[in-house]
């Protein structure tokens, strides 16, 4: 589908029009360069409606229909047709070169626009501004509505925005950058704009079209088909950190390296050629002054970007001619380049063209209405395959050597006069000067400076141009050879000129001054002048003087194109600068006048020197002219001698060029003479101005004396006023100090009131918290009391059950057959008792812990708040009430302690745990982590004590049985053999008890929060193991007495912690010692029962106390230990 233009063998060669082929075959354009461009035939989509039988682009003017492109498609909208302003929308697939129409016939809701701007994203096209009036041919009345076209719904939507809105405009530019629309410039009712606006397109919600038509205005047919946003959005005008470019419209714009690129355009002064960059991050404008040549003024041109290079194409100059040029601007090098491959198309007023980039290729969409049949062509080229005319010496910044100063936009400037339509060229292989026809485009007679703060002019352009040449010769360090061409200094196309045109006459100077060329040409040139001319040429390092003259003319023209204008040196410029610097010192009028006189004298000397230099320059130019004539005569003689046609043709061409150079030199001489006369006139004006200044000086001296007298009188008044001012200032300082003190006191009082209020509020909150804690502690004490009562009942029941169990054991010898049934009942009852005991222990433990924690918190809170509550009577009443409640709690606590001390008389084995707990009390204050190990030691010791208790109980049971059997056997007190066997009732009872203990031990291991279960279970295990050991013999009373004494002696060291148990112990011990052999069986059993019942009760209470000690905090632990001890 892609084919070269000149390749006629392909079927697509017919896509190129006849006019284009004529251009190619005529030889005016290099065919090798044209082959870099390829043409792609644009096809129309087959699926089109009857309303889209042909494209309505025949009468569309260039740049009147706007385009937008994304990564794959290019969209064209609107424009002016023969029938009026169009609202058609077409889509061009850049890959397949297929055109699709988005028009829907009569239901087409697209806005008709011309002079508008459109951009597109992935799924939306945005349209802003333009003109929709068919009668307005100048497009001065614009629109400020924003439309959005959605690709999915195929509908145009009117985006409603809040005020302030951008002014209506045409010819503006719009870019979409990161979902934000940026609008710049344009024209509104004949006024050119340079403002910039921003609109964020994120989150624009729209209503359905049916809801819109019900609310839209029926008179506005176009807007009745649009959708309005449900949410209003607003335009933003960003705050710029720099001044804006001059106002303009119909400029080109694109995005390069995150900056908005703006070039050219049109305003009141005509087409523009300046280049600006807008930084989106810093919101600042920067004018780019490129190195070397640059495009001329133009408007309506197209721009696109590939990497960091911007390509612009087309546009119109100041005469309205369409420019078939492709320029490239390298952003990193800040340099312009012109392509040497002209695009093989003929641009006209009826042709349209659009330029985009795709896959690093340049695509040019072109339609020429003169073709028959009319076709839409797409030209494609790779920028790498194009030949660009770049400067050979890129290190020579030509324009940087010329200083530029801001213009005051005065209406009186020096004109260069009329120039005829004649090109002016230098010799062969030299810098070509600009054609005189281009001067007529920009330098008309009585031309005035451009009224813009961004435009500049030269101060003494001649002197600066020569100075720049001297700097160039010193800094460039290059040897300009004979083939030094115009490209080294940057020739600006489209001001390229054709060398075939002859010169009719030289330009005439302004005014009535005339110069005779014959007299100027006949001036003699001596040998010294010719030598100085050669020296001048060698200093400037040009091949000849014509090169320098041509370069100077060219640079002058470039500056005029950019808005600069020639002006004479400002006589008072240095004076003004010095006056501004010395204004702060308040010089007298006499000193200022002296400075002015000195500056006038120095300026007069400078003008005289300039006149002398111009005279010598005229002499040098005359010598150059004579040398050129001699060279021409010499060339003619050579032509006559040779007979070869090629030599004759080249010499004729050379002669013609030499004639042009001579005439150019004469033109330069006339211009310099004109400048000389103007400088002389300025010198006369300066002399007259100096005389006026002298007369004014005398008047100023008289005025100065009068002002001095007035000043002396005013000085005395000023001194008195200063004294009064000082007094007032001192009074003001005193008042201000008093005011500061008063404010500080008020602030201190306010701060104190605020602190009192905060303390009162905090105190009130603390009192409420204390009442809540006391109520909670009272309820916890009630619960603990009920738990203690239930625990006492359970212990009482347990005591009764143990007594029944002992009676059953004594009657085992008489009820052998019923023993097993009774043992099972005892086993179930024992399990219930154990669970009830464990539950009561855990409840007591929990209630005691809650009580102790509540009491500790209550004590700490009361101690902290007693001082603060003294100031408030209500708080005192509450505190007294709380103290009364606290006393009641202490009484309850004492009662509970008494109850706990009463329980210490039942279990003897807990004395060993209590001893260990007392021993660990000294170390728990420094190392609480050892408390758990001590509790484990207590449990082991309780196991040992329980084992010993089991042995004592077994011995007691044996003694009882032996005493009962003593009535039957007179001599021996042994148990029967059946009782000692494994099948005896007592042995079977303890075997079953062993299995029961194993089950209960497994159950108690799960109840980790009740450590007493495992201890009692192991006691029973040890008792069962003792019963299942070797055959048990019934001891006598002496043996039983001995064994009981040994057990009591082993527990003597633990009895010191329980006074009541110790007393019982010594009573029993004394009885045993006194009546060792006189006790009967019944008395012995009664003594044993009472003794072991008290020991068991004491052990249970001590163990419960140890658990309470282990679970309480440090502070409550100290309080409990102090109260218990």
UniProtKB/Swiss-Prot annotation:
Family annotation (Pfam families): Kelch_KLHDC2_KLHL20_DRC7
Matches recorded under SMART domains: Kelch
Domain of life: Eukaryota
Low complexity: bias regions: 515-530
Recorded coiled-coil stretches: none
Cellular compartments per GO CC: cell cortex of cell tip; cell division site; cytoplasm; division septum
Residue windows of the Kelch repeats: 73-123, 124-179, 181-226, 259-308, 310-360
SUPFAM superfamilies: Galactose oxidase, central domain
Entry-annotated residues carrying Phosphoserine: 430, 437, 460, 523, 980, 982-984, 1078, 1080
GO BP terms: cell growth mode switching, monopolar to bipolar; establishment or maintenance of bipolar cell polarity
Signal sequence, start to end: none
Region: Disordered, residue numbers: 507-530
Keywords for the protein's UniProt record, in alphabetical order: Kelch repeat, Phosphoprotein, Repeat
Phosphoprotein in keyword set: yes
Gene3D superfamilies listed in its UniProt record: Kelch-type beta propeller
Cell compartment(s), UniProt: Cell tip
Protein's job: Acts as a cell end marker required for efficient new end take-off (NETO), whereby growth is activated at the cell end to generate bipolarity in extending cells. Also required for proper placement of the septum.
The protein, known as: Tip elongation aberrant protein 3
Biological source species: Schizosaccharomyces pombe (strain 972 / ATCC 24843) (Fission yeast)
Lineage, uppermost ranks: Eukaryota, Fungi, Dikarya, Ascomycota, Taphrinomycotina
